Amino acid sequence: MLTFRADDRVLLLAIPPVPDLVAMARTLATGSVVALGTLEEVDNARRDMIEFDNVMFLQASPERIPWRDQFFTKVVVPPHLERLLPDISNEIHRLLAPGGTIVNSGADV
C-alpha cells in the first residue's frame, strides 16, 4: 500500500485503475497526481476522473516525460516498468524534487 501526504506531487508512470486514482485524489487534498498512458488510456481516464481537479493525464512514455525539472515528490513505478529503470533513471531523477522518492506500486497497472 502506498502512503501519500496531502501535499505530495505524484507522478504515476502508468495509469492505475479508477478506484486507486480516486483514493489518491482524495488523499492528495493539496497535492496532485499526473499519470502517463497511451492516447486511449488518457482519454478514458480523463472521462472517468473529470470531477477531480488535482488529477491530470498525459499521453507520454516514461522515456521522455514532458514536465518541468524537480517537480514531483514521489514517482510511482509499477512492476511491469521496473525493468526500464536503468534506461529511465536519468529522466525520473530530473523530475524528482529534492528529497523526493521513487516507489514501487506493488501492483501492476
Q: Would you name each region that the model predicts?
A:
Residues 1-9, 19-23:
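Conserved alpha-helix/loop element of class I SAM-dependent methyltransferases that forms part
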